[in-house]
Structures are given as structure tokens and as C-alpha cells.
Design a protein with these regions (language model features):
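A short core secondary-structure module
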Residues: 142, 146-200
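Short Gly/Pro-enriched turn/cap motifs at secondary-structure boundaries
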Residues: 123-126, 156-158, 175, 211-217
């Protein structure tokens, strides 16, 4: 809470006014973002809800979500950088080989590397069966990935040593439509023999979007030019595997609504306590001032309580779902049924 209040919250305005800066060499995040991420990593926060086997703390998903709510309420733009890594970790953990888990999870869990989700292309978003990004098999068992992905949140930045892209692509002999999609790990830098950052891969950011909001987070056009990729899961079953990432993102999207609702409520109640206007119907509440704060007026209180009710309702559903995700790990049938309802695959 102290980190969110004292470090992230002040950077929210900085991120919104300054935004990200694109150049051919990469993306520069707003002033202070990189330093805040360093503190976040040093505090061990990225590892909170991940397995101890890969350096995590092994705590419940619901506890990790509580931390993410504080981060997101303080600074959603900043929080998306480590937030998307969570989905990448879950996907590699669920579908990656033992070697892939060894290579990528320790770095992602520690926060040294971050992750992204690369689905959308210029000609297709919701209809992923139309995607054109190609994956050509190579003699060494890797794949050559070629194509363009758009609207990639945190696709390029200067906050971590490496960025691990989880990419949907199509094999040469793949069936048409969604039944012919495969999933790949495509890192910005290829890992070296020691597990650190090696040579640059054929991945680059072509531009960043100029958005209405969340200016502090880079929403990128990502170009894959014969980039080396590694298959996750079975061929042509990539969309099934990607649903692991998408369900993590669904919880994150719900959390975004909660974070903004909570922040809006906090701002509104602060203003209502400061803004003076007329007197209370039951007599002066601030007789030493020219008028009473508007929080004393019934209609203002009604609006504030409505805001609070929506935020609390959202919070209840998000945390209940996260709790069911935790219980699912122990194969409880009722929890499985509930998550199939709220996080459909």
C-alpha cells in the first residue's frame, strides 16, 4: 500500500501528461516508470502468486489480485506492464515444455523479464480464424515467425531486460480458421546458454497508438520479421492454449473496472467533503464556514453511495472468482463449474 500510494500514485499524472515516446530503437516510458518498476521487482511483488519451483512465493491468486487492485487503482498505465506478465507465466506454466518453463519462468517470475499477449492483426481482431502471421518450421526445431500484430499492450518498453511475446501464428499446413492456429514463445532477445539475454531476435515495434487514455502504457504495433519462435502446446491447438492467457486477462479486465470505479469514488468523496455549497436541510453542519460541504446533501450522498455500491459489487465478484480459481487447483467440482461459467473457454 505504501509503494502504491507513495510511488505509483504520483506517477499517474506523469504518465498521463508525458506518455510514452517511440523511436526506431524502442519505446521510452514516462519519467519515473522504470525506477518504480525496479523497486517493484526488488520488493519481490511479481513473484507473489507463482510457484516456488520457479522462484515464486506460492501465495493464492486471490491475494495476488488484491495487490493488483492497489497497483491498478494507483496507476493503471504502469500496472499493465507487470500485469500482462502474469498471463504469460500462467500460459507457459500450463502448456510449456519443462525446458521452456526452466528458460522463461524464473526470469518472468522475478520480474527481470516481462510478457505480452499477441493476438490481433490489422485485418482481424475478434475473428482470429483470419490471422495471417506465419510460422515456418526450422531444422533445429524452432520456427520462423513473420507477421504483424497490433494493439499489443506493453509490447515494447525500457523497464525490463527482455520481453517475452506469446504469439498466435499459423503453420504452413494448418487447417483454415481457428482450428489451424498455433501458439509460440517469441522473445525480444533470445536467451543465451546461461539463461540470460542473448542476441536480438527479429522483433520490433513499428509504432505506438495515440490513445484517449492510459498514455503511460505503450500500445504497440509489433513486427515479427523471421523472428525465432518456440511452439507452446500441440500444433494447431494454439487458441485452446491461449485461453489460459485470455482468462487471466479477463480477470485483469474486470479488475480494471474495479480499479477505476474505486479511484472515481475516492476522488468524488474527497471533492464532496471540500466543495462548499448551500446549507444542509437539517441546519448548518459547518457553521464556521460560508456554506456546508456538499456531502451533507441527500442527493450527493445518494450518488456517492451508488458509486460505492457498484465498486463493492465489482470487488465481490472479482475476488469470489479469484477464490474459485484457487480452489480449482484442488479440483473441487463446484469451483470448476463456476469458473467455466464466469471464465468460459
Amino acid at each position: 500500500a505504501k509503494f502504491c500510494e507513495q510511488v505509483l500514485s504520483p506517477l499517474n499524472r506523469v504518465g498521463d501528461t508525458e506518455g510514452c515516446t517511440w523511436s526506431e530503437s524502442g519505446v521510452k516510458t514516462p519519467t519515473g516508470f522504470k525506477e518504480a518498476y525496479k523497486q517493484f521487482v526488488e520488493g519481490g511483488w511479481p513473484s507473489l502468486a507463482h510457484d516456488a519451483e520457479h522462484g515464486g512465493q506460492g501465495l493464492p491468486e486471490s491475494l495476488g489480485l488484491a495487490v493488483s487492485e492497489m497497483v491498478g487503482t494507483a496507476n493503471w498505465s504502469w500496472g499493465m506492464y507487470p500485469g500482462l506478465s502474469h498471463g504469460a507465466m500462467n500460459t507457459i506454466s500450463a502448456h510449456g515444455t519443462a525446458e521452456q518453463q526452466h528458460t522463461y519462468l524464473t526470469k518472468l517470475v522475478s520480474g527481470e523479464w516481462t510478457g505480452t499477449m499477441c493476438l490481433t492483426e490489422p485485418h482481424c481482431g475478434t475473428d482470429l480464424g483470419m490471422l495471417r502471421t506465419k510460422a515456418e518450421p526450422q531444422a533445429d526445431g524452432s520456427y520462423s515467425i513473420s507477421g504483424t500484430k497490433i494493439f499489443i499492450s506493453a509490447g515494447e518498453h525500457d523497464m525490463a531486460d527482455n520481453i517475452v511475446h506469446i504469439v498466435l501464428a499459423r503453420l504452413p499446413d494448418a487447417p483454415a480458421g481457428t482450428k489451424g492456429i498455433s501458439l509460440f514463445i517469441v522473445p525480444k532477445f533470445l536467451p543465451n546458454a546461461e539463461g540470460g539475454v542473448g542476441e536480438r531476435n527479429g522483433v520490433s515495434c513499428g509504432s505506438i497508438e495515440h490513445k484517449m487514455g492510459i498514455h503511460g502504457n505503450a500500445t504497440c504495433v509489433m513486427n515479427f520479421d523471421s523472428a525465432t519462435g518456440f511452439l507452446i502446446g500441440p500444433p494447431n491447438k494454439g487458441l485452446n492454449c491461449m485461453f489460459t492467457f485470455m482468462n487471466t486477462a479477463r480477470l485483469g479486465t474486470a479488475l480494471q473496472g474495479l480499479a477505476h470505479a474505486e479511484l472515481g469514488f475516492q476522488g468524488a468523496i474527497k471533492y464532496a467533503r471540500e466543495r462548499l455549497q448551500m446549507r444542509s436541510l437539517t441546519g448548518p453542519k459547518a457553521p464556521d464556514k460560508a456554506a456546508d460541504p456538499i456531502i451533507v446533501h441527500p442527493d450527493v450522498r445518494r450518488m456517492l453511495l451508488t458509486m460505492k455500491a457498484f465498486a463493492e459489487g465489482n470487488r465481490a465478484m472479482v475476488y469470489f472468482t479469484a477464490k474459485q480459481v484457487d480452489i480449482v487447483k484442488y479440483a473441487q467440482d463446484e469451483a470448476v463449474s463456476y469458473t467455466h461459467l464466469t471464465l468460459p473457454t
